């Protein structure tokens, strides 16, 4: 580990093999907390490469507990967190809409590390048992249409990294690696990242890991979602290649808004926002943000021919009551 750290602090890139070796040392408890902190900080300051992220993600995936839902197609839907915008849980809320529209979701996430409320926090506040066994999660995906894979249970080796990440309190490569380690091995993914500079390298890593259809998105406000506040950079995986472009809310008939309109709070506050959106009570920018992100996921999962068609399907799904019923079904299934 010392040799790898020496290379990083000089600003030199690691090979894929060196990254894999470092990750093996970290996830087996052979690296000290000081070494892990140095590794994460030096890598962040240098900037992570495609080879480094691929190597780190491959080892993390190999150590994960997995599920294999018996459904034809399913999607993972996740943000990296660490965007420091303190928005409500857009991707988590959107996941219920996507599932209710008929596209199963195998969602992987954690409690908050570098934000006010992670997916685990809001789902727990909604009444979901986030500590459900893998068999229960798998059945949830198959019967309810959505399951939540709580990172500490599905990536137990992360226990060596968690305390260091919490103490550092800054974005690290593990914000990126979490979504890439999806224990369901989803072939379709919508991943939000906190910097437009990361979309292509993350899309390339996803292709290296077997993702066939996907989008990596980052708002110009550094939101790790498709944003309503301005342009979003999109790197789309389709037909074995990555295409990068930008989209705006206006393209889809949605109104641009200030980031303040999308703010949330802790798990309890965000849970109420999620309920209000799924029940149809919330009709403002928060709802439109969910429609936009759910629409993109439905497009990626081939439930819609375009993002615009996906948005229309998402709106219809909420208005029919199906989205809030899916939330209620998940709560019941995970607590049975």
Q: Can you annotate each of these PLM segments?
A:
Residues 1-87, 101, 105, 256-262, ...:
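Acidic, glycine/proline-rich low-complexity segments that act as flexible tails and inter-domain linkers
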Residues 7, 62-65, 87, 102, ...:
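Glycine-rich anion-binding loops and their surrounding alpha/beta cores
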Residues 13, 83-84, 111, 120, ...:
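Gly/Ser/Thr-rich beta-alpha loop segments that engage phosphate groups in nucleotides
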Residues 33, 85-92, 113, 284-289:
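Short, conserved micro-motifs enriched in small and acidic residues
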Residues 38, 93-97, 289, 293-296:
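Short amphipathic alpha-helical face segments that pack within enzyme cores
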Residues 40, 88-144:
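A glycine-rich phosphate/pyrophosphate-binding beta-strand-loop-alpha-helix module
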Residues 79-84, 109-115, 154, 220-221:
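Acidic, glycine-rich active-site loops and adjacent beta-strand->loop/helix elements
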